[in-house]
């Protein structure tokens, strides 16, 4: 008997660093292809998918501003452009395997992609297209986690999935500490006041105010995204 899928529309957030794979910079084509195939499994199961990708594999606004030459505002805008580069790369990977995809940018770049209009984004999703949201919120000083949460709320997502390199949320970094304990569920308040890194406080507060569940899972496990949406235990953590 097939497991019933409980979430029809989701937003998946990937970090830019994840696209670099084992490299320190750029885009690993093998990682890009893996992510595209994971997204295809969702679409094939009638899940409407929005995507937000960070830009840290190219440039991070905070890091760019540390040298004292580039102002934080300009650094953040540079980071937004990096997310558009990643969005276009992901669009190519998705279309390469047969998925109709649109990129919408919070900053107008009409020669490359659509400008973000939430009603148009929803219409694309209803038609079975994948929508990738680039350029963050379009404003400096906001993270792509906050942008992902904002877009998830605007398009009416059932949940937001933060796809990472670990199986969920831990009380400390599992890559550094062997005794790290996985936390299957966590309240918004615990995520806000604790030392546990899930998303930045703005993103979590926004999710809390709008009762949007946050799921953290391993993006590198084949089939894991679809399992998460089917609510199978043991492969994710949830903040709600």
From Swiss-Prot:
Q: Which domain of life is it from?
A: Bacteria
Predominant location of this chain?
cytoplasm
Pathway(s) of this molecule: Pyrimidine metabolism; CTP biosynthesis via de novo pathway; UDP from UMP (UMPK route): step 1/1
Give GO BP annotations, semicolon-separated: 'de novo' CTP biosynthetic process; UDP biosynthetic process
EC supergroup of this enzyme:
transferase
Assembly mode:
Homohexamer.
Read off the NCBIfam families from this record: pyrH_bact
According to its UniProt entry, the function of this protein is described as: Catalyzes the reversible phosphorylation of UMP to UDP.
Official protein name in the record:
Uridylate kinase
Q: What gene name is listed for this protein?
A: pyrH
